[in-house]
Amino acid sequence: MRSLIYRQLLYNSYSVDLSDEITNIGAEKKENVTVQIGEFAQSQYAPVSWGSGETLSGNVEEQPLDGPYTPDKSNLPSNYWYLINPSNDGVVFSVTDNSTLWMFTYLVLPNTAQTSVVVNVMNETVNISIDNSGSAYKFVDYFKTSSAQAYRSRNFLITAHRLQAYKRDGDGNISNYWGSDAYGDLRVGTYFNPVPNAVINLNADFYVIPDSQQEMCTEYIRRGLPAIQTTTYVTPISYAVRSQRIARPNEDITISKASLWKEVQYNRDIVIRFVFANNIIKAGGLGYKWSEISYKANNYQYTYMRDGIEVVAHTTVSVNGVSVYDYNTGSLPTDFTIRNYDVLKESSFVYVDYWDDSQAFRNMVYVRSLNAELNQVQCVGGHYSFALPVGSWPVMQGGSVVLTFDGVTLSTQFTDYVSLNSLRFRFRCAVSEPPFRVTGTRISNLYGLPAANPMGDQQYYEASGRFSLISLVPSNDDYQTPIANSVTVRQDLERQLDEMRREFNELSANIALSQLIDLALLPLDMFSMFSGIRSTIEAAKNFATSVMKKFRKSNLAKSVNSLTDAITDAAGSISRSSTLRSANSAVSVWTDISDIVDSTDNVVTATATAAAKKFRVKEFTTEFNGVSFDDISAAVVKTKMNKLNVVDEEMLPQIITEASEKFIPNRAYRLIDGDKVYEVTTEGKYFAYLTETFEEVMFDAERFAELVTYSPVISAIIDFKTIKNLNDNYGITREQALNMLRSDPKVLRSFINQNNPIIKNRIEQLILQCRI
């Protein structure tokens, strides 16, 4: 592009420090995904790869292989694989309900000739025949269904690793492994004779494997156990909790102690409560459109009892990997539209940062052996009514997800007053019944939890569990370790941004049209609108650099190539989804910064893409300084910024970026070819008409594609429908029509001064769209 601002936006590159680069890398990873790290995040840097985050070695909820355990005779829990590793031949497994099933497994050693053996099993002496001529171990199942029957062999497993596994499902059916891996028929078989309450007797050392890890169990059968297998901590499965106990739920255990430091293990029962919060932003216009329904980080303080002691707790909830949906019924001002709304899905994660006033959190700096167990939480959405000016209100209702604990790490919560060392509990989302829908629309039977009303009728969601950690703390209990990297207390940027957005949008009605046109006559661009805020060139340069970093990752930086592809690919159908912004080529206050201009020119020459070279958007300039849509946007921003109470250097780049993405989303652009005008909109509509009569003619897509490469592209403040309506009702001269097509500000001002309702209404509608 030829204008300075777009050279800066699309091609400029400044030297930045490491934190800026990490922030930029993080921004590239959130394409079509809403990422809300939270008000009280662990650090200011976004993760390079979105996902569940770091998983520590001691944070697995269920260990894939837990054991070994000594032989056991009990009613073992269902839906777990019990992998036995016998050291001697003989009966290694038996089960009976004394009415419908008697079953046992006999291990036959390699190279055993056929012989008869007598075994004592389940209070019965049994004579069986065994043989194994091969070089591998053979597990043979013997089976009968009544006490009067004789045992007979049913199935067998041949394995080189002396391993067999058993599982009892929820119905009580027994499954184990049959066949041989050497012959390619290793498989899981099931005896459909339910024994749900029968005692299982394991006569060998065994390991416990969750049912979800069946493939791993099969690999152990085929290839043997790992070289080293030790139990590092209490596993959360029923058997281990019942048979072992490392510590009571709430106690402090001194592991080691020196003169200055000691290691203390903290075991705590905890109750985690959290409350989802959201942003619901209504777009401008007649009241039928919503621009955003999104999750936002939220903190919550509460108390609960632990061993008779009141605990004061503080949580902060945030989300990651949220899916973004939209709904659009049409382009009319009265068509119901939701541009973006967030939904928690299977790929989403919920983070809850937890802190309480107990001793465990006083010195949480040097920590090891961090473990936690939490129950599941089901979150069910409620109702949210979209209050339309006329007609029945659509209602978004339903939706549900189940949160399953997925890990725990250390974090730091930054509030406006204090920094808190915390534990960040990570929950994985799974969709559940019921689905959500919006009444009166096509949105129905979708699964997930939308952000419209994620709390439903709940005051808070609650998860109970416990955690354990070993912390290196001072030997003097009265001393508290300083929180690392917390030199100053960070003010809540998101809260300030919300206040600024709200104040910004409330000022829309206070801008006079005549004042707006006066401002639009100035050589405004997205930088010069802030010329009154920074008084020195150096400050202006730094501020411009900060804004540029924000812009480089926005949709605006990609819009030119997107429109080029759309025009090239569509033969007669113009459609595009991203926003193209025209630029004003007039010199602004920022052109005085010579080093920025020189750097920009060099970068443009070196890095301009082929598509950008072909699609050259030339600015249409006359002696009147033509007004463009960007001038309207810039004038609104400048006027509102002058009235805002809060102006912060960190927040302004964020506001500018949001303005570039969301200001005047319904745009029109036109090309003038002699007495013929081509006009396209960002909503995919296109038409051509004559300047003399405003009669619509056939849209020549090939001619338009040719013109758009070499001719000026004008932002149409007064679109074709408005000009035609003005001509039909008031009558305008050919010269006035041409000036309207060229967006001549003098003509616009004259119509506004005459209180022309058609032109005035058009400008007012543009201003109403200027919302963030």
Swiss-Prot record:
Cite the Pfam families for this sequence: Rota_VP4_MID, VP4_haemagglut, VP4_helical
Keyword Membrane assigned: yes
Query: Is Cytoplasm one of the keywords?
Result: no
Q: Where is this site: Probable cleavage?
A: R245, I246
Q: Which keywords does UniProt give here?
A: Capsid protein, Coiled coil, Hemagglutinin, Host cell membrane, Host cytoplasm, Host cytoskeleton, Host endoplasmic reticulum, Host membrane, Host-virus interaction, Membrane, Outer capsid protein, Viral attachment to host cell, Viral penetration into host cytoplasm, Viral penetration via permeabilization of host membrane, Virion, Virus entry into host cell
Q: Which residues form a coiled coil?
A: 483-510
Q: Where is this region: Hydrophobic?
A: 388-408
Position of motif YGL motif?
447-449
Region annotation (Spike head) maps to 65-225
Stretches the record annotates as Spike body and stalk (antigen domain): 247-478
Q: Which GO cellular component terms are attached?
A: host cell endoplasmic reticulum-Golgi intermediate compartment; host cell plasma membrane; host cell rough endoplasmic reticulum; host cytoskeleton; membrane; viral outer capsid
Q: Name one GO biological process term.
A: permeabilization of host organelle membrane involved in viral entry into host cell
The site annotation (Cleavage) covers: T232, Y233, R242, S243
Region (Spike foot) spans which residues? 509-772
The family this protein is said to belong to: Belongs to the rotavirus VP4 family.
Look up the further comments and give them: In group A rotaviruses, VP4 defines the P serotype. Some rotavirus strains are neuraminidase-sensitive and require sialic acid to attach to the cell surface. Some rotavirus strains are integrin-dependent. Some rotavirus strains depend on ganglioside for their entry into the host cell. Hsp70 also seems to be involved in the entry of some strains.
Question: What protein name is recorded for this chain?
Answer: Outer capsid protein VP4
Source organism of the structure: Rotavirus A (isolate RVA/Human/India/116E/1986/G9P8[11]) (RV-A)
